[in-house]
Regions:
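Active-site loops and adjacent core secondary-structure elements that bind or stabilize anionic groups
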Residues: 11-12
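Single conserved hydrophobic/aromatic residue that forms the stacking wall/gate
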Residues: 1-8
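C-terminal peripheral helix-coil segments that are non-catalytic and often amphipathic
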Residues: 87-90, 94, 125-141, 145, ...
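Amphipathic alpha-helical linker/stalk segments
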Residues: 55-83, 121
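Short coil/turn segments at alpha/beta junctions that flank glycine-rich nucleotide-binding fingerprints
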Residues: 19-23, 74, 95, 141
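Helix-turn-helix
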Residues: 3, 16-50, 54-55
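Short amphipathic alpha-helical segment with a characteristic S/N-K-E followed by hydrophobic residues
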Residues: 47-52, 62, 115, 119
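Short secondary-structure transition hinges
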Residues: 83, 90-130, 151, 178-183
Length: 202
């Protein structure tokens, strides 16, 4: 059974991978930051690849669950999309380093792309399927305008991701302090939802 000290240190382990990426994250540094011995880390995870796999799978599962959990047939479709867009935005706000992590580890690294893209694709596909059925029904009921599910979800993902990827540029270009930036991000959440609504409303 995994020791309590290691379980309690897993957030440190995740942060190290998100900060450094796979190639630059050293298991000795991970163990030191997590407050465990290198031998203990190796005993529970065997290899850096296994540790990375655990971190990646956990983040993908968490994101997928947070999105699917917003879908409820008892709510109007627009409300479901408001909740889904907001949940995705909040997930990135809680994991702001994740977009860069995915870019580095999947888009720029062919080996890890082959290993982990299917995991990410499976989670995205599951969300798409859940949204697609509800979207088709909403269009038939005349609630929303027709749109391909892939286009809708890509718009949601790209709007939300760019709100965080572009933070440094926005902060410098508009000379925003920390509080201004916090307010800007809060406003982006509402703006992103409104932009999705503007495409769906009849």
């Amino acid at each position: 059974e995994m020791s309590a000290s290691l379980v309690g240190s897993e957030m440190c382990i995740r942060d190290r991978f998100l900060d450094k990426g796979f190639a630059l994250a050293k298991t000795t540094e991970i163990a030191k930051q997590a407050g465990v011995t290198h031998a203990m880390l190796h005993y529970y995870y065997r290899t850096k690849e296994k540790l990375f796999e655990r971190v990646f799978q956990e983040k993908v599962d968490l994101m997928a669950h947070s999105l699917v959990a917003t879908l409820d047939d008892g709510k109007p479709f627009l409300k479901q999309m408001e909740d889904l867009t907001g949940a995705h935005f909040d997930f990135i706000a809680e994991n702001p380093k994740l977009p860069f992590f995915l870019l580095n580890e999947i888009h720029l690294n062919e080996k890890r792309r082959e290993l982990y893209l299917p995991v990410l694709s499976s989670a995205v596909r599951n969300t798409l399927q859940n949204v697609e059925r509800r979207l088709e029904q909403a269009v038939k009921r005349g609630e929303v305008r027709p749109i391909r599910t892939a286009d809708l979800m890509f718009s949601i993902f790209s709007l939300n991701v760019m709100s965080f990827v572009g933070q440094s540029l926005v902060q410098q270009a508009f000379d925003l302090d920390r509080e201004d930036m916090r307010q800007f991000i809060l406003q982006r959440r509402a703006e992103n939802i409104e932009m999705i609504f503007s495409r769906l409303r009849k």
